Every structure is written in C-alpha cells, then in structure tokens.
Amino acid sequence: MRVVHVASEVFPFSRSGGLGDVLAALPAEQARLGANVTVVSPWYATLSGTPQEVWRGEVPGLGPVGVGELRASGVRFLFVSLPAFERPGLYHPDDVERFCAFGRAVLPVLQALGAVPDVLHGHDWQAGLVVAHAHLAGWRTAFTIHNLQYQGRWNLAEARTWTGLPDWTFSPEGVEFYGDLNLMKAGLVFAEQVTTVSPTYAREITTPQYGEGLEGVLIRLALEGRLSGILNGLDQDRWNPRTDPDIRPYADPAGKAANGSVLRAEFGLDDAPILGVVSRLANQKGIDLLIEALPELVERWNVVVLGGGDPLLTAALHGWAYHPRVAFVSGLNEALAHRIYAGADAFAMPSRFEPCGLSQMIALRYGTLPIVRETGGLVDTVPGDVGFRFADATTEALATACRDARTTLEDVVEWQSRMKRGMELDFSWEGSARHYLALYRHLCSVN
C-alpha cells in the first residue's frame, strides 16, 4: 500500500500545533505496519533539518519548483520548495494564495519522482486543493478535518486563477462558498472519504453549532457514508512518564509527587494542589472561562498556565501573574509543558469545541486528571470515572467541575484509583493507523 500524506506541517521539521504532531506519528505507525508512506509538506525557510534536493523542474503556471527529501522512522518526507515559502515562519496573511501554489505543485512533483500513490490523504484546508487535483486526475483520495474553523477562504474573483481548477468547479456544488474560494470545502467535495479526528466531532460538525457553515455539505457526506471519525493517537515514546528526560521519571501515582514539588519550587507556589493548563490562548479553548473562574479557583488551587495566542487573553493572564497562586508563562516551552503534565494534580480543558485534543491524553498518561467540557474528542477520551466532565460552556460549569475535582482529591484512595486507571488507558497510534489503512483498502477496492 503506497500512501502519500499532504499537510502544511510535520514535527519535528515544522510545527505550530497538533497537526504537526499527528503528521509525525500517524505516518510512522503506518510504516511500522507495512505501508510505504510519504509525507509532502512545504519547504519553509525556517524548516528544522536540511533536506537533500532530489528534483528541480518547471511546473506549468508556477515556474521553478524544487523538492528536498529526508527520511525518518521509516517514512519518506518530501519538502516542496516554492518562492512563496521563502520567508520566516509558517503561516502568513496570504496563505490562501501560497497554499494554492503548493496545491498545484504536489501532483507534478509526485509524478516526476515516480511516487504516485494508491491513496493520497490530505489534511486540513492547506491540502484541500491537492485533494481536488488528485481526484480530477483519477487518484484515490481521503481528507481529514483537524479543525473545521479554519477553512482557507478568499474572494473567488481574485483567487480562481490561483487554483488551476477547471471553470465548472467554481460553483456552490464545488469550491465556491458565498462568493469565496473555500479550500476546506475543496477537500470535502472532492475526497472520496472524509474523516475527522474523533467520532464525537464527526457527529457534531453535521450541526449548525459546530458545522461552521459547512454542515450542509457534511450532512450529505454522512448520508452517503463518506464521513467518519477516527480518534487520534498519542506518541507514547515522546510522552512517557517512565522515560521522559524533562521530568523526574515515574511509573505509578506514588512516583508523581516529586514532580509536583519541582513545579512548586519553580514558581514559588504553596502546598495547595496544582491545576495545570497547556493551551493555545483562544476563546475556542475556553481560556476566557478559565480567567473568569480564577477568583474562585485560587481559593483552593495553584494554577499554572503555559500558552500563547490571543493578546487580550495573554494580557489578562499577565494581570493575574501577581497572585501567589497563579503562574503564567507566555509562549511555547516544550520542557515546561512536560513538567506541568508531570507536576500538576489536575488539568483543565474547558474547550468550546475540541476536534480531538492531545493534551487530555497526555495528562491522563501522566496521572494528571483532566477537567474537560463534554465536546468532541474530550468525550471520546476522558472516561467519567477517571476525569471530571461538564456540559455547558460557562464559567460556573467549569468552576463546579473544579470544585468536584478538589473535593475528590481529598479522598486519596479514590484519587489514586482514578490516576491509575487514567495511566493505563491505551492511546497508542496503532489502532488509529489500522483504521486508516482499512479505509485506504476500502477505497482501493471500489471501482
């Protein structure tokens, strides 16, 4: 089985969030299971690693295009070099135009390298145009929604010349969306099978509350049997409390306490239990609810927050950092994230929506009990007899769940029993990888 994944980022070469993590772990597991796997991504100026150039040529409508290659974990990584990506950083305001160029380059590159796959699998809107071109070329295609909120939209009158698509595709049945080009919709419409990253999120996005305006398309896909949810896994080598070099390793609840002491010492916290948060700072993640709940939370918890994003939320958290029970570090810090997962007692994820989420799985693996809103992948991964769940996206609902967790924490036997059950849950990528490979085999068996 020859599989090509296409995505805008892949850890450790380029990463801004969970998408990059998925594109590191899923292809590696598929390769371990015997598939021939290639990942195609842009060759960013700030790429970590030095690919070896394996091809350079002209692509109609784009001009010179180069391709670099790296290999790791049994996977071939191809990086497409285009002028639009020769600048610092991953994402920019003109990304629709940039990823249209990328989308037009991928098929000619794969053809030139003799790497035409059995199935091309695109991820999120940045790969939507690739899926459209692959489908029109007669290739088997799958497409995964990682976050429906981001759709890659631009005024169609300006953007249509960027795509290389035939005129008939610029319609409401195709890639047009209220006068815009919509690259997420391109992936949905032209993929033979569409997946998203948890079963609950697959159901949620067929409703107006979560469908981001595309629920009509998604309802049709569901009725046609073309929409499903496959839960993401967790890289259990990278996130392993037994071997993690950034913490004091431990294998059971009893060994966790030393990491709490380290975290308290690092931030000058008292002996109150620690509520951890590692998150992008956005209203989607419910960080505004967390901030509104802080006056009550600090009565019974130390609160340690790591994350970057929305300037207003960042400023609000900086305003709380004076409090002796609040610690806030702005930005990304991988080692500190590991210390928070290991040192906190509980972990808050009050997301308004969460397609899958990785943080709650990491927290469970580290014996840190999640306090989560019942949405998306949080429903599918946090059992009610392990973590603490609440239904409404309100400050009061979050505060109530945190009160319940704090009360339960007083029962040492119950708390450690929950920790043990959480640490024993299996979030390995093997099950997810097998589900995707079965989906590919189904695609290849259909005439």
From Swiss-Prot:
Name the UniProt record assigns to this protein: Glycogen synthase
Disulphide bond pairs: none
Enzyme class: transferase
Statement: the UniProt record of this protein carries the keyword Glycosyltransferase: yes
GO BP term, pick one: glycogen biosynthetic process
Task performed by this protein: Synthesizes alpha-1,4-glucan chains using ADP-glucose.
Keyword line: Glycogen biosynthesis, Glycosyltransferase, Transferase
Xref: InterPro entries: GS/SS (IPR011835), Starch_synth_cat_dom (IPR013534)
Organism: Deinococcus geothermalis (strain DSM 11300 / CIP 105573 / AG-3a)
Catalytic activity entry: [(1->4)-alpha-D-glucosyl](n) + ADP-alpha-D-glucose = [(1->4)-alpha-D-glucosyl](n+1) + ADP + H(+)
HAMAP family: Glycogen_synth
Stated family: Belongs to the glycosyltransferase 1 family. Bacterial/plant glycogen synthase subfamily.
A matching Pfam family: Glyco_trans_1_4
